[in-house]
């Protein structure tokens, strides 16, 4: 009986860790049609959970200028959150995807 409770508790804890800590922000500009796949995917490396962030996440040079940027997504996945968890938030990578107009 105790063994079964322990397995359920460990499974619940593992599931909670897998589904938490992920975040995604999407910014859409204008009503232009958007490419299905991103033009560029960039991983930004931040330290101390970007306190005092000075780095720009969107770099329109990949799509030929800011006027061609239609959508930007910033995401912190489980894979990105894992180093932050291990380092207690000192190192926190984040992915950014830039979509251009078709």
UniProtKB/Swiss-Prot annotation:
InterPro entries: Lambda_Bor. Keywords: Plasmid. It comes from the Bacteria. Pfam families: Lambda_Bor (PF06291). Increases serum survival and confers group II surface exclusion. This is Protein iss. It comes from Escherichia coli.
